[in-house]
Amino acid sequence: MSNKLCQLCNERRPALVRPKTGQKICKECFYYVFETEIHNVIIENKLFVRGERVGIGASGGKDSTVLAYVMKLLNERYDYGLELYLISVDEGIRGYRDDSLDTVKRNQQQYGLPMKIVSYADLYDGWTMDNVVARIGTKNNCTYCGVFRRQALDRAALSLDIHHLVTGHNADDIAETILMNLLRGDVARLPRSTEITTQSDSSPTKRSKPFKYSYEKEIVLYAHYKKLDYFSTECTYSPEAFRGTARAMIKQLENIRPSSILDIIYSGESMQLASSVQEQLPQQTTCERCGFISSNRICKACMLLEGLNKGITGLGLGSDRKTKKLQSQIPACAE
């Protein structure tokens, strides 16, 4: 076998070194193994049911753009029989989200998929992330955005009678989350952070991660070679410092041992919670104010909104004891 030919087909010249395996392969073989591995993950985990409506969380970034492209491709190639929709959230970040939404709109035309866009301003008393950051600064802004975004996706999905969302979380993201939970000693969150599909009894939608075992570098390479239209600028408001530290550690490990990302995921999957720890997890119910999932009487989104509207920064960000005390002072119905 010539070392100048693709190590998989032995016919074409290699175009890249595959990050996950170190193999020198051609573009055609890379497309095939990348797409086939995702298909196998979908089938082995029985992610979808024929005839199901599935919402694709679309931000315009590389992960969600490749996800939309691959989901459409595999749905047609293997006849999954799914109804696919793009769902996007406008957080209200001028100079970032407005530009990325333009990318999502182009993707909608390119892929021919129906699309739904919801905004923080419409859902949360006129609050945008620009307004939130102007009020609280950048210390906890990612917490606000994460809580609001999750509920916004739920609301958009329900408006389309969708009860299953797929997101572009990749292997790197999951490995980072596992590492963060371990460093915090938060083992109770390990099962949820490693599951490919998550849903609680009272959640309106379940969420799946078809890219659970897909490396970020390979997603970037796929988008590059396929010439996909995506928005590459990072969020204006810097990511959470702790996650950034975990990300740097993951990258260092990957440089030394490419399999480290999957090794961390497999390790997280193998860790089992003791029954005593499981019993300590909060029981999930629905928020008395907005009706969405919550482990408390008032959900975190409503708590955060209450703080913003009353000028009490940090409301809903403290310890469970402090949060529950504050919740007892909040009426179930908005004033």
Swiss-Prot record:
**Protein name per its UniProtKB record:** Cytoplasmic tRNA 2-thiolation protein 1
**Gene (UniProt):** ncs6
Which pathway or pathways does this protein act in? tRNA modification; 5-methoxycarbonylmethyl-2-thiouridine-tRNA biosynthesis
Q: Matching InterPro entries, A to Z?
A: CTU1-like_ATP-bd (IPR056369), CTU1_C (IPR032442), Ncs6/Tuc1/Ctu1 (IPR000541), Rossmann-like_a/b/a_fold (IPR014729), TilS/TtcA_N (IPR011063), tRNA_thiolation_TtcA_Ctu1 (IPR035107), UPF0021_CS (IPR020554)
From the broadest rank down, the organism's phylogenetic lineage runs: Eukaryota, Fungi, Dikarya, Ascomycota, Taphrinomycotina
User: Where would you find this protein in the cell?
Assistant: Cytoplasm
Report the source organism.
Schizosaccharomyces pombe (strain 972 / ATCC 24843)
Q: Which SUPFAM superfamilies match?
A: Adenine nucleotide alpha hydrolases-like (SSF52402)
Its domain of life reads Eukaryota
What does this chain do?
Plays a central role in 2-thiolation of mcm(5)S(2)U at tRNA wobble positions of tRNA(Lys), tRNA(Glu) and tRNA(Gln). Directly binds tRNAs and probably acts by catalyzing adenylation of tRNAs, an intermediate required for 2-thiolation. It is unclear whether it acts as a sulfurtransferase that transfers sulfur from thiocarboxylated urm1 onto the uridine of tRNAs at wobble position. Prior mcm(5) tRNA modification by the elongator complex is required for 2-thiolation. May also be involved in protein urmylation.
Question: Where primarily located?
Answer: cytoplasm
NCBIfam families registered for this protein in UniProt: TIGR00269 family protein (TIGR00269)
According to its record, what are the GO cellular component terms? Answer: cytosol; cytosolic tRNA wobble base thiouridylase complex
Please report which protein family the annotation says this sequence is part of: Belongs to the TtcA family. CTU1/NCS6/ATPBD3 subfamily.
Give the molecular function GO annotations: ATP binding; nucleotidyltransferase activity; tRNA binding
